[in-house]
Amino acid sequence: MKGWWGKILRVDLTNNKVWVQEYSPEVAKNFIGGRGLAAWILWNEAKNVDPLGPKNKLVFATGPFNGLPTPSGGKMVIAAKSPLTGGYGDGNLGTMATVHLRKAGYDALVVEGKAKKPVYIYIEDDNVSILSAEGLWGKTTFETERELKEIHGKNVGILSIGPGGENLVKYAVVISQEGRAAGRPGMGAVMGSKKLKAVVIKGTKEIPVADKEKLKELSQEAYDAILNSPGYPFWHRQGTMAAVEWTNENSALPTRNFSDGSFEFARSIDGYTMEGMKVKQRGCPYCNMPCGNVVLDAEGQESELDYENVALLGSNLGIGKLNEVSVLNRIADEMGLDTISLGVAISYVMEAKEKGIIKDDDAPEFGDFKKAKQLALDIAYRRGELGNLAAEGVKVMSEKLGAKDFAMHVKGLEVSGYNCYIYPAMALAYGTSSIGAHHKEAWVIAWEIGTAPIEGEKAQKVEYKITYDPEKAAKVIELQRLRGGLFEMLTACRLPWVEVGLSLDYYPKLLEAITGVKYTWDDLYKAADRVYALMRAYWVREFNGNWSREMDYPPERWFKEGLKSGPYKGQHLEKDKYDALLSEYYKLRGWDERGIPKKETLKELNLEFVIPELEKVTKLE
């Protein structure tokens, strides 16, 4: 094969065993890589496992774009059965570990078992070692990466967990390069459960490519197109931070546990304020439009900001000072905690305190930076009753406290940075996301509003009317095919296309130059649909067939309450109309009214092997 190695590196920490597994060209062509390869592995190998048990498989998967000079092709997918949701879980990050894993000669690394004592894996091409990490256990991700570079040199890729992963916080993530994070549904906790502190990779091999000259030509064209885009200069200044002003103007900025869509101190935490604080930019490998805006926080330390962490740790907590928000963000990265879920967990505690449900004097109230910081640390170390409870995530916390009405999650995963009282398409995207409430798979809100953050120096406020047109379901699927499918399989960042308008035509051409396989758009959409159906089948199987359409509903708050302020004050989603939109989504996907893929759909997608497994737990149409 060209473009793929056709090899998966396997490590069994229980038995201290390392081996290489080969997989077929058919699997490579059908699942491409990244999320596709990870979903295929988990379907076959992680059946009815305890997410934090030794039988769960932790998958580090790359795609054909990785390790090569492709536009923003420095991503890696990390996947496992989620300890937070109980279903399929994954996330991606940009890291040199991706480049080195590919150059070491592997398309993926799969870790199983559990070490007796803390270890890290060191990979140098064909040589793989399992080494002691007892001296690293308990250290932050920043400290861990720095110490490992002192041992192995700077020319390596490193993935590590912090105290959050070690203490099995359900939304612990994997960190690389002091600020890049992956695995919102608890991939860091899975890593911690295996006593795996880090993975260090050094690769020196040349990746097999079908047409090097064509790849070079297309990549250069794409890089030039990005730099010459009208939106590039503003993007270079603010990156995703431009979305703070944009969401605030359009009543979508999470504010005080999503109780409102605009924040009175938004100007103090937006992209313009960030510009005045920025000391450097960070980007992923092979990226010429870096989005990591690094500022000095209130404690004089560097903190890498983007929209999501500022929205969830800022306005959502009622905190209006960017240097304080930056401290919370840095702590999350050092501790190895997902900034989004951490922000929603803390905001839930704040609202529960406000309502008198939580009476703990140490619990923070909205706007209380110091107590929010302390709670973040308590969560990472599972200190105290409140820290331990909040470490379980909002779903479990709300169930134990008997207060579900303001628990902002879907399938157990906390909602990311877009408030959807008046945006049914975005609510549908959250409801049907393959990992729970996350925006990366179908950031449909810009299409729904009719304007995007990077369209000028001033965020546009538009005349907007809530509609539930069937085309909204079709648009969600279209974006899921691209954002949650194509880009996650390649594995490449979607931002060149989303933010500065890089033509989608480059991607199949680049894929052909790398692999020699000519994919039509129908082929790519079918591959995306195949992976979505497989991920949904995984959820249904792991839930033993106990599945209903209610699993695809957004949080109740968006149905029952209205916005508290702004031009859409009092407005909210209507459940019957959302339900109709959900039915349209199922129809277009070829799923039944419960949200389970039909037999015929599975056959059309070459997923016949899924049918017998699903029929053991539920009846298929």
From Swiss-Prot:
Give temperature effects on activity: Optimum temperature is above 90 degrees Celsius (at pH 8.4).
Keyword terms, alphabetized:
4Fe-4S, Iron, Iron-sulfur, Metal-binding, Oxidoreductase, Tungsten
Would the keyword 4Fe-4S turn up in this protein's UniProt record?
A: yes
Q: Does the keyword Coiled coil apply?
A: no
Q: Where does the chain bind tungstopterin? A: K75, N92, G94, R180, A181, G183, R184, D333, L337, D338, E488
Which enzyme class, named as a word? Answer: oxidoreductase
Instruction: Enumerate the residues binding [4Fe-4S] cluster.
Output: C284, C287, C291, C493
Which Pfam families does the entry mention?
AFOR_C, AFOR_N
Q: Which reaction does it catalyse?
A: an aldehyde + 2 oxidized [2Fe-2S]-[ferredoxin] + H2O = a carboxylate + 2 reduced [2Fe-2S]-[ferredoxin] + 3 H(+)
Q: Which InterPro entries match?
A: Ald_Fedxn_OxRdtase_dom2 (IPR013984), Ald_Fedxn_OxRdtase_dom3 (IPR013985), Ald_Fedxn_OxRdtase_N (IPR013983), Ald_Fedxn_OxRdtase_N_sf (IPR036503), OxRdtase_Ald_Fedxn_C (IPR001203), Tungsten_al_ferr_oxy-like_C (IPR036021), W-dependent_AOR (IPR051919)
**Activity modulation notes:** Inhibited by arsenite, iodoacetate and cyanide.
Q: Mention one GO molecular function.
A: metal ion binding
Query: For this protein, what is the EC number?
Result: 1.2.7.5
| Cofactor binding comment, as recorded | Binds 1 [4Fe-4S] cluster per subunit. Binds 1 tungstopterin cofactor per subunit.
> What does the UniProt note on pH dependence state?
Optimum pH is above 10 (at 80 degrees Celsius).
Names of required cofactors: [4Fe-4S] cluster; tungstopterin
The record's function comment reads:
Catalyzes the oxidation of C1-C3 aldehydes. Can use formaldehyde, acetaldehyde, propionaldehyde but not glyoxylate, glucose or glyceraldehyde 3-phosphate. Uses ferredoxin as an electron acceptor for formaldehyde oxidation. Involved in peptides fermentation.
User: Which family, according to UniProt?
Assistant: Belongs to the AOR/FOR family.
**Assembly behavior:** Homotetramer.
Q: What is the name of this protein?
A: Tungsten-containing formaldehyde ferredoxin oxidoreductase
**Which organism is the protein's source?**
Thermococcus litoralis (strain ATCC 51850 / DSM 5473 / JCM 8560 / NS-C)
Lineage of source species: Archaea, Methanobacteriati, Methanobacteriota, Thermococci, Thermococcales
